[in-house]
UniProtKB/Swiss-Prot annotation:
<keyword id="KW-0614">Plasmid</keyword>
<protein>
    <recommendedName>
        <fullName>Protein CopA/IncA</fullName>
    </recommendedName>
</protein>
<keyword id="KW-0615">Plasmid copy control</keyword>
<dbReference type="GO" id="GO:0006276">
    <property type="term" value="P:plasmid maintenance"/>
</dbReference>
<comment type="function">
    <text>Controls the copy number in gene replication.</text>
</comment>
Length: 61
């Protein structure tokens, strides 16, 4: 969780912007279980990778 906190403190709007883009392209949000795994993938991603990489890895799921 400390990785998530450090990323959030550095880029507070990154996650919200990424979620907004997802909502625009994907339409309605996915079920809660998939939303949870989506958020988990962002937390697991190392700081050296950008959120775009995390989004691409989630698309593979």
């Amino acid at each position: 969780m400390w990785i998530y906190r450090s990323q959030k403190s550095k880029n507070p709007d990154n996650l919200l912007q990424l979620l907004r883009v997802r909502k625009d392209y994907r339409g309605p949000l996915k079920p809660y279980s998939q939303q949870f795994s989506y958020a988990g993938s962002i937390v697991i991603c190392p700081e050296k990778f950008k959120t775009s990489f995390c989004a691409r890895s989630f698309c593979a799921l």
